[in-house]
């Protein structure tokens, strides 16, 4: 549940930042894409769709995404994301607890925009 709440609030932060910061909104318009964040068993997740600088988000697994950020399970995802540091994330990748499926460039773009939204 904590993982899903964190993903929900990530979407709220991105929307809020875009509403209050015209430069940030321009950066969101750089890509039209769908980013999926989910658990490996597909039981928990959320996706974010960016179209011409606007973002929509929904709970669940998207039918199609440009990149999927796949966590081994919700507990590992929440604990790692809560730390908010790149070292912890890289450790999860090295341990096989986090995988990217699809366009890594889109994943990096999304992670940068998520970080800027804080």
Language-model segments: what does each one mean?
Residues 1-118:
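Feature captures hydrophobic
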């Amino acid at each position: 549940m904590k993982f899903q709440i964190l993903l929900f609030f990530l979407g709220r932060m991105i929307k809020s930042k875009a509403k209050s910061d015209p430069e940030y909104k321009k950066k969101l318009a750089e890509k039209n894409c769908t980013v999926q964040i989910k658990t490996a068993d597909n039981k928990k997740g959320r996706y974010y769709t960016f179209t011409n600088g606007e973002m929509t988000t929904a709970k669940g697994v998207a039918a199609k995404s440009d990149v999927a950020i796949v966590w081994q399970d919700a507990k590992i995802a929440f604990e790692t994301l809560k730390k908010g540091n790149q070292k912890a994330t890289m450790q999860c990748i090295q341990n096989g607890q986090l995988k990217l499926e699809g366009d890594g460039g889109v994943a990096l773009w999304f992670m940068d925009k998520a970080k800027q939204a804080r």
